[in-house]
């Protein structure tokens, strides 16, 4: 990890020297100074800005072939000359930066917090908070109404260096991100075997045993897989079930108590009880034999064949298809009778969607073009796609009377694939207040939100989750170093205990090892930034 960090720093140092060396020379990747003031759209005379971007291989090589950008050019009078990379973006972006021939801005920049702080320190990008106040009324309005986003955008040095992507789909406990590893159960098998939906962890064991031994698919073969998952930090892990035994677990192994204390989840006794429960399933032969080895493709292949009794994923349509054979597994009561759901720390926010470089000579024009992306109707299209495209399937239809967008039926088309062909991405904001006024909510999101509200929200006790705080480079390096070793150790030991047992005899040594990796320092840093975020968002 230290070697990788050093290498990245070296590349960025080279980049900064190249940028400085390029000062005073002709920069063909950026635009000339148009000397514009008091910019209003559309411009009387078309001007060109030069941006670098990343896009999906499914989308056109020239982003200007997208109808969204064609309309935007007409509305603003600004032509964008794109350098568009559809693969290996970070590597190509860094090479361009190191050449010193910078564009006016980098769109969909994909920058880590370390990148942003390095670029700022070396003079590759500029702070933008003054531009927001002076030239960007759409974004400023959002930040005034939602100060928590401004707190998340602000770097430890007090500056804002990048423009965010914001996608609200539900708020607080009712956010679409509150649960990722949703558990799904084969209700056709329940019906075939005359079983009721399980209500407790003990019930689940009995149901899974029946799935194993009762030939619920009726083919006369013992080919059913009672319980399957993909182990790790995805949306297909079983850790969701651990909440039946206490505070539960999530991908970060981090929850925020209602007293504001940041708690680690993978070192307490109820985590141990959760592991022991999954160990029971292993001992009874109920777990997919390939569960700790298979990849996404083999997982969905089994899902499409409907071999699973219980499995985990964000949306069942991705694994077992759009049928009624599977339903949500309700929150299960544990041995104490407790029902609990541990929230994830996911949220619809990313601060790395656009930066303005230090060679940009048209700051007002650039800022106002970016601000146009934060207009509600524009943000919705940039995020999901557009309407009125004669060349391909549309995401929306435009209601001209209300000037709002309505999602069209997908008719079997994969939503992610269609969106990648038409969306623009980049800096945007979609607030919950837009639904029903500016746009309808995507059907798949509405369906999932309804499930979360019905099945999970009543059992969420934690008011807050851990936000995407902006740390100093020093603390980022510390966290990255600790997480790299500690998280690998946590998942390795969990798998060993499930397959081989011995958690009780090894538990104390496990906790000592977590301390050696730096758990106490890790929690102290996390707590410090959580407290700062709470103070700054108000």
From Swiss-Prot:
Biological processes, Gene Ontology terms: polysaccharide transport
SUPFAM superfamilies referenced in this protein's UniProt entry, alphabetically: Periplasmic binding protein-like II
Recorded topology in the membrane: Lipid-anchor
Binding positions for substrate per the UniProt entry: 167, 235, 314, 318, 353, 384, 419, 423
Mutagenesis / variant outcome for changing residue 314 to A: Loss of fructooligosaccharide (FOS) binding. No growth on nystose
Predominant location: membrane
Endoplasmic reticulum recorded as keyword: no
Outcome of swapping residue 384 to A: Significant decrease in fructooligosaccharide (FOS) binding. Impaired growth on nystose
Lipid-conjugated positions (S-diacylglycerol cysteine): 23
Molecular function via GO: metal ion binding
Signal peptide: 1-22
Mutation effect (residue 423 to A): 10-fold decrease in fructooligosaccharide (FOS) binding compared to the wild-type. Impaired growth on nystose
Binding-site residues for Ca(2+) 1, renumbered to this chain: 215, 217, 219, 221, 223-224
The protein's assembly and partners: The complex is composed of two ATP-binding proteins (MsmK), two transmembrane proteins (FusB and FusC) and a solute-binding protein (FusA).
Domain notes: The calcium-binding site is essential for the translocation of fructooligosaccharide (FOS) substrates by the transporter.
Role according to the record: Part of the ABC transporter complex FusABC-MsmK involved in short- and long-chain fructooligosaccharide (FOS) import. Required for the utilization of long-chain FOSs. Binds kestose, nystose, fructofuranosyl-nystose and inulin, but not sucrose. Has a preference for long-chain FOSs (tetrasaccharides and larger).
Identification of the protein by name: Fructooligosaccharide ABC transporter substrate-binding protein FusA
Organism: Streptococcus pneumoniae serotype 4 (strain ATCC BAA-334 / TIGR4)
